[in-house]
């Protein structure tokens, strides 16, 4: 996860979505109900997906969508069948409750990521009748294009967006989404960034076995806060290509 898409506002009561930091307290909540983890599909409730995307990040999605109504109208167009795209159905995990409602979402990218195409996104946006938000170009060029740029090690992934809806906190949902990803034997490493202002998130990542890598760098856009890159190396990783050769 790059330094432009760090965290939602920490005022979770006003956003309806917790910051990633709040996940450290998830196991203290109400009695667990049935939650299933799987990939996002075109049949899912994209108004709930839009709520997730619009509120999980305080920089990117208000710039991209303009407002929450824009997010509800447009979010489905953002997702792609291309398994190597950012916002791929293949690389978006959702947690659903017993009614099929989306409780949480985790968006990640792989080691090979299709370059972000601002023109394609612009055309899709205009085709469904939305005016371009004032900072649409900034969201695409300064945020999303840069997220898809850095290369990752073979079979590694990077978590870009993670959130749990209000009403589902305290049930370990964020942790379950994370566990589902790091337990995947096809994933060699999981990368993410954590803000200094989120010690709870850092504690959670430490618990999962993430280790800091490299020096801290400034947070976008004001540079007043440190960001630490962290990596989890999957001990259960199986390199299928090497397995086939043997």
Give the label of every model feature segment.
Residues 58-79, 115, 126-130:
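Conserved GNAT-fold acetyl-CoA-binding loop/helix
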Residues 188-202, 208, 214-246:
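C-terminal "cap" of GNAT-fold acetyltransferases
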Residues 69-92, 97-98, 146-148:
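Active-site rim helix/loop that mediates acceptor-substrate recognition in acyltransferases
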Residues 94, 101-110, 158, 163:
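Conserved beta-strand in the GNAT
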Residues 6-46, 237-246:
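Conserved N-terminal entry element of GNAT/NAT acetyltransferase domains
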Residues 170-183, 203-207:
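Conserved acetyl-CoA-binding loop-helix of GNAT-fold acetyltransferases
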Residues 34-51, 59-64, 110-111:
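A short beta-loop-alpha structural element at the N-terminal edge
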Residues 112-157:
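Conserved acyl-donor/pantetheine-binding loop and adjacent beta-alpha core of acyl/acetyltransferases
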């Amino acid at each position: 996860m790059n330094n432009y898409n760090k965290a939602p506002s920490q005022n979770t009561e006003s956003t309806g979505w917790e910051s990633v930091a709040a996940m450290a307290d998830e196991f203290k909540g109400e009695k667990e109900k049935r939650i299933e983890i799987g990939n996002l599909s075109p049949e899912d409730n994209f108004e709930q997906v839009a709520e997730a995307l619009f509120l999980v990040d305080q920089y990117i999605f208000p710039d991209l969508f303009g407002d929450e109504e824009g997010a509800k109208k447009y979010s489905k167009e953002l997702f792609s069948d291309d398994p190597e795209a950012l916002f791929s159905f293949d690389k978006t995990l959702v947690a659903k409750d017993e009614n099929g409602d989306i409780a949480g979402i985790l968006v990640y990218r792989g080691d090979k990521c299709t370059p972000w195409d601002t023109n394609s996104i612009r055309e899709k946006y205009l085709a469904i009748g939305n005016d371009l938000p004032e900072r649409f170009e900034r969201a695409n060029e300064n945020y999303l294009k840069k997220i898809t740029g850095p290369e990752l090690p073979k079979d590694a992934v990077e978590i870009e967006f993670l959130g749990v809806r209000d009403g589902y906190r305290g049930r370990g949902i964020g942790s379950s989404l994370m566990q589902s990803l790091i337990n995947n034997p096809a994933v060699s490493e999981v990368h993410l960034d954590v803000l200094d202002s989120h010690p709870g998130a850092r504690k959670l990542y430490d618990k999962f076995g993430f280790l800091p890598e490299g020096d801290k760098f400034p947070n976008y856009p004001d540079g007043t806060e440190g960001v630490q890159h962290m990596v989890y190396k999957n001990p259960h990783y199986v390199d299928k290509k090497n397995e086939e050769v043997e």
